């Protein structure tokens, strides 16, 4: 088999979510070495390291022949690589291997949730261009959330998602829903302004959020548009019932309680100022400005999901 790439770099964290990271790296490397003449394994020890490595690749200090990047981790780790690639304008395809607590975007790429199977799928994958959301000075691949989404993330203690799995996350979500924090908002999408009061807002680029799929056939991370969802009180009551049953988010039951607005340019201010979750990382506060960057990044996409 001819290797399509010269030099690939696989980024990973020691605390990526895999029980045995070194054994996992070995399994992944078997597949990736079939794709690349040269494969470098690059440990990211601290937050921000991946962005620094992207700068080094851009300046050719890392190597002059890197032509593909791989990331082993969850949505937060992928977000760091996306920011490095966008910030330093690296026109390189990215192969994503699930290895964290949440791997929503790998579903969009039709990749299997098992890291070994997903790395094997990359052998027959192809590069496709996907939209990126620019949120103030940061870049987002999957979603922007505020209100209950941030509340819930802060209620889950560090590491508990790995130790107790889905149950701990759902228990925290129910606790959050019983004590929602409401806020006033002013939302402008492509020049049209909406004002109101809510306790949860979501701006989605990808169709998979929080382990569930948003049931909109026209929602695509390749259409040049972002989708804003404003949740009302009725929706939150249904969400609470669903989560108490420990089921996945059932969008079909709650869509009647959601305002949906699609557009290319979004500004959002709130009172009071609210923390903002971007792909699982709480890095911003309102006000925010969001611009859709059409087909700004290349991601390796499987032909079909391997179940």
Curated annotation (Swiss-Prot):
Coiled coil: none annotated. Pfam families: DAGK_cat, YegS_C. It is an enzyme of class 2 (transferase). Its EC number is 2.7.1.-. InterPro entries: ATP-NAD_kinase_N (IPR017438), Diacylglycerol/lipid_kinase (IPR005218), Diacylglycerol_kinase_cat_dom (IPR001206), Lipid_Phosphate_FormReg (IPR050187), NAD/diacylglycerol_kinase_sf (IPR016064), YegS/DAGK_C (IPR045540). The active site is at residue 281. One of its GO terms (biological process) is phospholipid biosynthetic process. ATP binds at residues 44, 74-80, 101. May catalyze the ATP-dependent phosphorylation of lipids other than diacylglycerol (DAG). Belongs to the diacylglycerol/lipid kinase family. This is Putative lipid kinase SE_0507. It comes from Staphylococcus epidermidis (strain ATCC 12228 / FDA PCI 1200).
